[in-house]
Amino acid sequence: MDTLIRMLDHHLSLVGEIIDRTDRLDDRALDESIELSVEGIDRDPTLRSVTNRLVGQLEMWVIAVEGGTRVPPGDDATPGRLKTRLQIVGPRFRELAVGALRDGRADETFIDATCEPPQTFTYGGMLAHVLTFSAVRRTMAIGALEREGIADLGAGDPMHFVGGVGADASTIKRNHD
């Protein structure tokens, strides 16, 4: 099992689940400030802005890796549009990440011309960045959903998604020599 790819799959799946649940909410709930903020991640986060950023981050990196110079504005952040955007960009981002890891190119660099001035990043660094910053945003989004009475996503913990369901430890017999 490639743990990084399983973590990426969990991320893409959970973002989709979060977006699906935002479709149940009105604009007030989507645009209400999220009280728990993490300095340096997002300014004045709302459920809408956080989910838009979760999808937009994937779009930005795909454009950068493919040599683009401009990231389109993500102003259409309705749940339906976010779902469509994720369905398009999720598989593309996954393909880039899987290809880089499979081919041993995690340390290979690419030029991100969407930055001013252009910057150089590694594929592995890009994936680590996405998984780390997205974990914070997913947690904020799940908290905002819970505030609105939608609590079926738990904490968004990847443990079971990545490693399967654990066994009841009370039934384990140990042999002592």
Q: Residue ranges of each PLM-predicted region?
A:
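Short, contiguous alpha-helical
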Residues: 5-24, 30-73, 115-177
